[in-house]
């Protein structure tokens, strides 16, 4: 969306329905609220790629002498967005701080995937209210996926008037202008684009660490699973050009990074929106095999778009790791249909068979929702049996959380919460049982570990991850942080492995 489109959209959105309260008259500057109705639309407008991001002269030294603090909730995409916002803050002259008490600007980068995440954000806004009273010049902002929801923005306007700015996921590159508006406005600045944004290249980033890096390869999702708010908050699927991705990863490799995670809400749909070339995730991964970097992984996959070419490429190994996160959500074909997942139990199991055939030592992990509206005991048992049949190493498990604006939120639900909790407990027992069973197979093996740093539980112990994303703890010199080492596994736990260093760092060729 260019500036002209932004202004046109702003004017269009300012004309709200008569029955809705119109807050725009209270604002001197920007009031562009979200619209889930607009966010659901998938137009044929060309997605523009902007490569000339830069700060105008008016923002030179804008943040000199000021500090910023960003609290991040949710997925890796939010982590990456925070890195971009930190890069913009730094370019403006701001310095980071790890304390809200010490900050001149506090941003909450939010997640909308479950109600619990939203409750945490509103709880934090309550804590920040007293801080704002003590420091009236403090700027407080809410950004990320929650900002794309109408109900959230209305709640902020009504009950959290100490918030100075609200912006969404499509206009992070406009952070300097939003900051300026918030700094000089007497009222809350709201700038949320409900239609998909453009692809903005060359945004500054302050990455967390210098060992692993997130790299966005696409944005948005067009799947519209009935329970999921993400297609509304992140817009339509739009892919970065392969040459831009490859250039970024080569630059990271040249700067010593050892592992790259390719990000997308539906990473397997990469390239499906290209009109000038036939180029998908399999093609990209095949090219990235040639980049001089130790490990490349990706998340998150959708089974519907996981094609044979990608499986073939992953089977070539090299720097492509043997770990795939493949959310199934349910083991029941009937339940998958109600969820609008667009695949069946049989399709998923056949996909798993193909993956295991191409990558015999693959580790599969997944996401599962229990207690979806009207889920029967039989349908839940199908999920349990699929989990055993696939033999997942672990899973992220959740009780269904209604998201306002999604079709599932309107469904009548006859499953009592007590039943949902009991099902989750049973599933988690199975997950834990298989996790320790899978991890026990590593005992006595020598594995490659990329050393992340000190263990969270013991600074005398180092921690790192295998190619299959297993956490390994071992005692060794801190000089090995950031290196690839070989570790012999001596003990297997449910969520981690313990081991002993067996040789010097591995040379990455």
Swiss-Prot record:
Annotated residues for binding of [4Fe-4S] cluster 1: 75, 111, 145
Concerning its family, UniProt says: Belongs to the methylthiotransferase family. MiaB subfamily.
Species of origin: Bacillus cereus (strain B4264)
Name the principal localization, coarsely classed.
cytoplasm
Q: Which one Pfam family would you cite for this protein?
A: TRAM
CDD domains (UniProt xref): Radical_SAM
Q: Enumerate the cofactors the protein uses.
A: [4Fe-4S] cluster
| The protein, known as | tRNA-2-methylthio-N(6)-dimethylallyladenosine synthase
| Compositional bias ranges of the Polar residues kind | 1-15
Q: Which Gene3D superfamilies match?
A: Methylthiotransferase, N-terminal domain, tm_1862 like domain
Q: Which gene is transcribed and translated to give this protein?
A: miaB
Where can this protein be found? Cytoplasm
Q: E.C. number, please?
A: 2.8.4.3
